[in-house]
Amino acid sequence: MGFSLLVLLTASAPFSASAQSLQSVEAFTEPQNSQSERAKGASGLPLPRFVSIKSDAANVRRGPGPDFPLLWQYQRRNLPLEVIAEYDDWRRVRDHQGEEGWMKASLLSGARAVIVRRSAHAVTLRAVPDATGGVVALVQPGVIGTLEACKGDWCEVEVDRYDGWLPRDQIWGVYHFEFSE
């Protein structure tokens, strides 16, 4: 007699982000390049690129420096962000909701994470990269996972000690051209 265990993974901590839209800091904003011609930032790393938050709390400012007004504070370790510009040791970042601001580079990590996109339902974490693969867990929108690899339309993710595959279009934090076969 066999049985199946179905695990529902939910977001454990809210992230704080202002609902207000940011005014652009045009003096410091670089144009976003097409994915095929990714520019290099001041750090020598490609722009844009994905990173994650290193600590439990990370301030976001209106401009690249401590004298710029504080806009909000993220309170969610490993939240994926997209670096879209650099100025000295500051990074202009965009989150999965489209909010932008500047963060000190030391608050960010190159470790890759993804967040399940907002939708009306949980996403199935599969044992193999196929819609017919065995169910490992159901993952709620807003849950963060560690990105391990992608294969076609699927990405291998570790979520709360569960390993499996999520559809690439159901997560934010990876470009369509990354991990190409």
Q: Model-flagged regions — what are they?
A:
Residues 1-13:
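Bacterial N-terminal signal peptides
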Residues 19-62, 73-77, 84-87, 94-99, ...:
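SH3-family beta-barrel domains
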